[in-house]
Amino acid sequence: MVSTPFQPLATLDHLVVAATTLADGIDYIAEITGVAPQPGGKHVAMGTHNALVRLAEQVFLEIIAIDPAGVKPARARWFDLDNIALQAELTERPRLIHWVARTTDIERAVAHCPIPLGNVYSMARGHFRWRITIPDDGAPPGKGVVPTLIQWDVPLHPADTLPKSNMSIAGLAAAHPDPGVIRAALAALGLEGVLPTTYDRDARLAAMLHTPRGIVTL
């Protein structure tokens, strides 16, 4: 009997950096990396807007902030952006708060993950259409260490529209008070090799980037 190679349910799609304002986030990334983020657009359903940097084929860095011209949604915004404590931290500097993994079968991936990822919602920005997991309270799963899942429903990926940036991922790392649970969730999605996770009392996520200004850690 011929065995079928394991097909991961998900792969890295993008990193999420939050900022108090989008301008602050753009300036911060440009200053520490030497790479200018490109304009993204508005997420009307969430009252947020973003800017992007290409990191690799179909992989990008997203800078996101609450859109002051947008309408506050009736539900909690994604990525915990309504969290007062997070917003207080963002006044110090923009921060890497989460990551998003891409799948071609989001319902199956959600069912396969031992950590609840939230409900699946349909979203749009410009020509892009996608489905994404969002917990009811907006807080990222696993304190930000377990990824949100996304399934793009159009052929064009956001990174395909961005210029090459001379910036790429050197590595990712995470810590969590219960790393075994996190490792099990990542393994269920086929992501165990993407994000090495160790023990710490406080959950945290780090991304090391090759940039024109050397290795930069977010």
What does each model-found stretch correspond to?
Residues V2-L12, V17-A36, R54-L218:
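Glyoxalase I/VOC metalloenzyme domain signal
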Residues H43-M46, Y199-R201:
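A short beta-turn/loop motif at secondary-structure boundaries
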Residues A36-H43:
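Conserved catalytic-core motifs of GNAT/GCN5-like acyltransferases
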